[in-house]
Amino acid sequence: SLLGFALFLALGILWHRPMLALAGAGADRAVVDFHSHTNVSHDVRGTLMSKFDVRANLAWHRRAGFDAVFVTDHNTIAPATHADSLPVRCPGIEVSAWRAHIVLLGDTLPVDRDPYSRDWAGLTRLVQVSDSAYHSRSVASLPEYERNHWDRLDSLVAAGLDGFEIVNASPKANELSRTHRDSVIALARRAGRFVVGVSDHHGWGATSMVWNLVPVPSWRTTPAALCHRILARLDQGVGSVQVLERHRLRAESDWPSLLTPLGVVWETWRGMTGAVALSWLVWIWGIALVLDARGRRRRDIIPPPQSRTS
């Protein structure tokens, strides 16, 4: 039923169930997420994910197979948290600039967004000084740069922008078509900039859509230096990161907008291996059989109505 389908989607969003993890990256490549959030971000703090703190963020990324994660909260820095195991927490911040969100990767400390949120000059000023003032690499985040600055990406690059997101797992950022994605990659390649895929995770859901493989030889011998080495690698441009994206519903697909939830489920199934699809079927049919058995038992217990005689 439609209600059952809605409950299935809600459960998938809210339940931090076991998830698919990336494995087999090798000793000389780190699996990295370049954009994620905790409950110090305004759009996490006031939601059902209000308990999604740094530890919960790291635990989510650990289950997904990440070695390092940049915690990039909105216009603020999450408290320091000690962790003895992977993934390594890397520093960063997401600045709400003028009609754009710019992710700064590096130990920026807090950033006053006001001078950068007023106009185009403020936005370009942010990417100009991201290195000198904040010792960070600047990344244009989806969907804002596509929606608001598509015709002047060259100008952002000329001002000093270091990289672009080409995959963002946030539902609102899934509209980037393959054509636009390829245009961004071509621009980055010409200008010597890097491109990344990001979870932009806010605590919802339990399956990563994208991973980044960054070549960092023998990084496990000195994990404390991993964040610095990842940032240094980004300076080598497009070839510095290999983006791995799961099969999903694309913006240019033929699915009608009203059927988007159904299309998401269908395309998810299409991208599964046989073993994963079988696991889904076992769970679905197992739950259905349990519910059916309970219904039968209830019907057996209820006595038949007594006939009345005059």
Language-model features: locations:
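C-terminal functional module detector
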Residues: 1-24, 190-194, 199-310
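A metal-dependent hydrolase metal-coordination microenvironment
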Residues: 15-139, 143, 148-152, 157-160, ...
